[in-house]
Amino acid sequence: MQLTKITGRLPLFAFIMLMCASSHAAAQAGSLDPTFGNKGVATAPMGAKAIAIQSDGKIVVAGAGVSNSQFFDTLLRLNTDGSLDTTFGSGGIAYLTPPGAGSAPLGFFALAIQPNGEIVAAGATQTEQGGYTNFVQVALVESNGSLDTSFGSGGFTAPNMIAFTPYNVTGTEALALALESNGSILVATSYSNLLVRFTSSGQLDTTFGNGGIVNLANQGPNTSFAPTQIALEKNGKILVTSGGVAPAPLVQAGTISRYNINGSLDATFGAGGTAACVASASALLVQSNGKIVVAGSLTSKLNAPPAGNDVGFGVVRYNSSGILDKSFGSGGVAVADFGTSAPLSGAFAVAIQANDEIVAGGAAAQGALNQSFDSAFALARFTGAGALDTSFGSGGLVTTTLVSGSSNVYSYVTGLAIQTDGKIVAAGNTAVDQGFGSGTGAYVVRYLAQ
């Protein structure tokens, strides 16, 4: 009788186990994480430019936002489940503005978290000094979202660096940021193309370059190149990428340069300190083995079409000497083809997983060239050898449509981060009519890694 009862339960037990196994199998790498936000997606009333993950797993997003009809430098913090962290700022959002009359914040464009949990964010502020002029701004924010007033002036530093700009431009913005091991802060700026070092207290570090400022190599008025990212090698040397559209032919291109700790160009890297890049060099990281990974937009998979509109994902790897790593991809270059030739595809962010696999994030156009201005969040994952990881998404590629039912919706990833459990967190934005219409806000999306 007892044997009969046990045998009668076996089919139900087997069915439950089968369902569990099927559910696990369905959760493929690259799938949205259903435990985060709303089915893997969290939204925020701001524009997102950068993302970082704290040691406790909370997610910080930097950008710009509007509160009470005023524009602010904005930080957002999410709990690990994608909900707003109400212990941060006002209900999870910190709206910040630099002190001083006539200063208007333009937003944060870069972000890093110090070992003590304080947040460093960099961007730009606009002043009315002889007309509207943009200045670099760096802010130090306490873990509760309030400004650390011991830093700079009231928590912000925004030095006037126009005298250092090499091309007679009238302003500058911080686009990239990195923290050195001694607490110093490195910032790379647009328009003026400067590399700037601040002390941990927010002052220009006069031991670096010329009074704390270095004019970046291979930048000038004949290109649209601008600094995009900073990364530090284990020995403290400084890598800086710049990218844009080369003037002739019109193709996506970039450079990567290396600087010594004192700000001098490291002539042992590449050709005299700089290496060329076939991609727009939008993002930069250093792998655990010292190899250098650059991700960006690639024109026509290395062949320039008319007007340079055919753009895709490109990941380029260099040895530590600045020479292309020919063991990676095809001659050092790996390409992700999302099956479209519209001009809105490209990689803008990169992250490296614990196993040294590379995740690139950006936008994938949802239509043919000159026929659609729609794009989706896009990820591509590459193995350490530069091949697409076919266990991820569909053949190594993932696209996520965040806004449906509208036309000309441009969705794109601006930042990537990897959690300690390997999950991939992407931050980005959507905009209607390529950003010339109304925006729909920021999105933070979490993907399963395995």
Description of each model-found segment:
Residues 2-13:
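Bacterial N-terminal signal peptides that target proteins for export
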Residues 11-22:
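Bacterial N-terminal signal peptides
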Residues 2-3, 20-450:
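Extracytoplasmic mature domains of secreted or surface-exposed proteins
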